[in-house]
């Protein structure tokens, strides 16, 4: 399996005051820091090598996760430094740790799709980038992709139109070549690069059917907490949720 970069360096201002003293990756979900759930999922998916792109309070993530022994993963770190580089700049800086091609996952996303099939689609297509997409129709968040005839025709998070029925699922596979010409310490959003790659016809797509979960909002935290709460058996043999204290 390809290595995976997790973008976990943001300030998470939407979750204040929760994230005033901890990074978003350490927000408690169903009794564990979110990143523990995320790494457990990646291990189940066959991932072996993880690069954590960290910035704000990144040392706290390192202190918890370490080199990944408890997860049976190889984990390395790429630090933004004194200036936060944005999702794109942070990933650009991490390239020496990632090899020629790699998965990319946002640090607040829990995406339980088939990663092996996503990688196979990337390798079969031959384009330097692949984005997983979901037919969303504004259900889970605002749709930002115009998708027609098996192709991403337009990707734009700022200028949405009613014709956009799909959304960027949150998992991509990228070749390092799409970063050619971008300075190592550049500050930019990965969505800006994605838009350019789509506009120049270099972005492949892979449609998934599983919904995404995220901890970027309080509603998202409630939804993923319900998903991951431990289950216990009722007297009649049916599962019920073991509720956690809020």
Please give the residue ranges for each predicted region:
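Short catalytic helix/loop segments, enriched in acidic residues and glycine
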Residues: 21-36
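N-terminal nucleotide-binding beta1-loop-alpha1 segment
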Residues: 1-20, 45
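Catalytic-core segments of class I nucleotidyltransferases/pyrophosphorylases
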Residues: 102-103, 110, 116-123, 137-139, ...
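Conserved beta-strand segments of alpha/beta enzyme cores
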Residues: 25, 74-76, 128, 202-204
